[in-house]
Swiss-Prot record:
One of its GO terms (cellular component) is cytosol. PANTHER family: ASPARTOACYLASE, SUCCINYLGLUTAMATE DESUCCINYLASE. Belongs to the AspA/AstE family. Aspartoacylase subfamily. It comes from Prochlorococcus marinus (strain NATL2A). Binds 1 zinc ion per subunit. It comes from the Bacteria. It catalyses: an N-acyl-L-aspartate + H2O = a carboxylate + L-aspartate. SUPFAM superfamilies: Zn-dependent exopeptidases. This is Probable aspartoacylase.
Length: 305
C-alpha cells in the first residue's frame, strides 16, 4: 500500500499572502499545525509571483493545469511551466505522489470562509461533506463554465479549494490566518478519521451550484460604466430576487436582476476577476442527498484500493 500523502498549496496567486505566511511560520515550528501523522508537502504555488507581489507573472496559475499545457510547455510562460513542475513533483505519477490536494486562497469579496469544488468527483464531494458537517462552510460547486478551466486541484485524484475573505491583496489579517489554520487542521483531522475508518458522514450536502457569471455594465467602447449597487455590495450568499438592484451608474440608472428564479450571488466585486470580465457569479442553492459512492471513493483513495 502506498503511503497517504497530501499536497498543501498556498500562494497559487502570489499576492494572496496569508496562507504563504502561515506556511512559512509552520516550517519554522512544525508543532503549530497538527497533521495527525499524515505526510504532507507544503508548497508555495507561484513563488515567482510571490516575489513580484503580483497575482501571476504571465498567466493565472489556477487556470494553467490543462493537458495541452503539459504537452507543449512554453518556457516563456512562468505559470504553465510551474503547473507542469507541480504535477511532475506531486501528481499521481510524480516523484512524491499525493492523493489529495488542498489549495488555500483569499478573496477580496465578502465570502467569509467557503469550500470550492470543481465538477462532481465522488471523493471531492465526500471530503466537502465532512468539512461542511464539521464547520458549516458553504460549498460552491463550480462547473459548466468553459471560460474558466484548468484549476490546480483538478490534476489530483481529490482536491478542494479553500477561499477566505474579505481581505485586500497583499495584506496580512489575523482573522484570515486563524480561519486558514482552523480549516487546514480540520481537513487533516477528517482525512485522518477516514484513514482510520472512524468517521461519520452527514446525510445531506448543501451545494451552491454555479449557474453563470455576469460582467459589469460597459459602454460602447467596452469600458466599465457602472458599479455594484450599494445594496448588493458585500451581500455574497444572500438570495437575489427579480427586480433586486445589481448595478448603478453615475447618472442614477439602476440595473436590476431580471431572472424569474432566485439565485445566490458569490464573489461579488472580486478584484482579481475584473480582468476576466466577471462582476459576480450566480449560483443555485441545492440540498443533495449524500451518496454512498462518495464515501467509498474517498475511503478507497485514502486506503489506495
Amino acid at each position: 500500500m502506498k503511503q497517504l500523502q497530501v499536497l498543501l498549496v498556498a500562494g497559487t496567486h502570489g499576492n494572496e499572502i496569508n496562507g504563504i505566511w502561515l506556511f512559512d511560520e509552520w516550517k519554522k515550528s512544525s508543532f503549530l499545525i497538527n497533521t495527525h501523522g499524515i505526510k504532507t508537502f507544503k508548497v508555495i504555488g507561484n513563488p515567482e509571483a510571490k516575489k513580484a507581489g503580483k497575482r501571476y507573472i504571465h498567466h493565472d496559475l489556477n487556470r494553467s493545469f490543462k493537458e495541452e499545457s503539459f504537452i507543449k510547455i512554453n518556457p516563456l510562460n512562468c505559470e504553465r511551466t510551474r503547473a507542469s513542475e507541480l504535477v511532475n513533483l506531486y501528481g499521481e505519477a510524480g516523484e512524491n505522489p499525493c492523493q489529495i490536494a488542498l489549495d488555500f486562497h483569499t478573496t477580496t469579496a465578502s465570502m467569509g470562509s467557503c469550500i470550492v469544488v470543481y465538477g462532481r468527483r465522488d471523493a471531492d464531494l465526500a471530503l466537502a461533506s465532512l468539512i461542511q458537517n464539521q464547520l458549516g462552510l458553504p460549498v460552491y460547486l463550480h462547473e459548466s463554465d468553459q471560460k474558466q478551466t484548468g484549476f490546480l486541484v483538478e490534476s489530483w485524484p481529490c482536491g478542494l479549494v479553500v477561499e477566505i475573505g474579505p481581505i485586500g491583496q497583499g495584506l496580512l489579517n489575523s482573522r484570515i490566518i486563524s480561519q486558514t489554520k482552523l480549516i487546514l487542521e480540520t481537513l487533516m483531522e477528517q482525512i485522518h478519521e477516514v484513514k482510520n475508518l472512524n468517521l461519520f458522514f452527514p446525510n445531506k450536502l448543501i451545494i451552491h451550484r454555479h449557474i453563470k457569471s455576469i460582467d459589469f455594465p460597459r459602454d460602447e467602447e467596452g469600458n466599465i460604466d457602472g458599479y455594484v449597487h450599494s445594496l448588493r455590495q458585500s451581500k455574497d450568499w444572500q438570495e437575489l430576487k427579480k427586480n433586486d438592484e445589481l448595478f448603478c451608474k453615475l447618472n442614477g440608472e439602476i440595473i436590476r436582476f431580471e431572472e424569474d428564479e432566485p439565485y445566490i450571488p458569490v464573489f461579488i466585486n472580486e478584484a482579481a476577476y475584473v480582468e476576466k470580465n466577471i462582476a459576480m457569479s450566480f449560483t443555485k442553492r441545492e440540498l443533495w442527498n449524500f451518496k454512498k459512492e462518495w464515501k467509498q471513493a474517498l475511503i478507497d483513495l485514502i486506503h489506495q484500493k
